[in-house]
Amino acid sequence: MKNLMIPALALFLSAAAQADDSPLWMRYCAISPDGQTIAFSYQGDIYTVPSSGGKARQLTTHPAHDTRPVWSPDGQKIAFASNRSGNFDVFLMNKEGGEPKRLTTHSTNEYPTTFKDNGHILYLANILQDAKDIQFPGTRFMQVYEISTDGGRPDLYSSLYMENIALSKDGSKLLYNDYKGYEDPWRKHHQSSITRDIWLCTLGKDRSFQKVTTFGGE
């Protein structure tokens, strides 16, 4: 019996080692502004890795879930969401890691989506304001808020639910995907009337919207 257990144990350890060498479920990849580094979340922590390849560096080690990293325009800061205080809040840390700073404190979940500039972050939240102040009242649809990297009181940036926002360098336009109804974003090959589309928004006094994609899938 002992002779049978040794090969089985060796096979198990070999499989475990192979699994460690080929990690899966790395999510929310974000390329640094200079294109040299990729930030991503893996098993509840934030990592960075050179875009040319190499060993990943772990930036957060908290037992809570850290996810959705986004870079500041100068590439010196990374904002991310963490539920280390109960619900998900927006945190800010240096690109090398270190002690992060908590920026939001609302009781609902909040997720960073992009930096407006080096001093301001746009994030998604559902603060449940009065119906007159939001596009679609309810708990399912979030709004876009803006907060300083120093913290403080957030401002409503858009009552329209915008996901995966990308601002142009001059800040005059933004790309985003819409949200028509609930669908698992990780579902593959989904096509229906509620799949997300990409839109281009021209900011300014006369704000305009242009639909970029018409594909029936995500």
Describe each model-derived feature in a short phrase.
Residues 1-4:
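Positively charged n-region of N-terminal signal peptides that target proteins for export
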Residues 6-14:
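Bacterial N-terminal signal peptides
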Residues 30-35, 69-77, 112-121, 165-173:
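Blade-terminus and WD-like Trp-Asp/Gly-His loop motifs, strongest in beta-propeller folds
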Residues 50:
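Periplasmic/extracellular electron-transfer cofactor-ligation site
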Residues 15-19:
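Sec/Tat signal peptide C-region and signal peptidase I cleavage site
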